[in-house]
């Protein structure tokens, strides 16, 4: 399915279009997340972030410009990865003494 048709269907609330987007772009999104995190995230964290990217797509598909879906997904994936890395860097375990 081409990007424009996929976006049109997403904008009309078509859940099958979301499933198609996940099938078509999940490997790309996970690769972006993995490369951006430089292996600092577990595969489970990478998958969780990828799910979050597609949830954001579902919520914000009206803001995606036609013909730019892949770039938009990559940008969201990079931003979410950086946010996760920042958050994990700021978390300091408390000693239980």
Write out the residue ranges for each language-model feature.
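Hydrophobic side chains within well-formed alpha-helices
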Residues: 3-6, 17, 49, 69, ...
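Arg/Lys-rich amphipathic alpha helix in sigma70-family domain 2
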Residues: 63, 75-95
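Conserved short alpha-helical segment within the catalytic ATP-binding HATPase_c
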Residues: 54, 58, 77-78
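Short, charged helix-capping/linker segments at alpha-helix termini
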Residues: 12-20, 30-52, 63
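Short acidic/histidine-centered micro-motifs embedded in hydrophobic/aromatic stretches
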Residues: 24, 52, 97
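Short, aromatic/basic-enriched loop-to-helix "N-cap" motif that marks the start
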Residues: 45-48, 61-75
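N-terminal module of bacterial RNA polymerase sigma factors
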Residues: 1-27
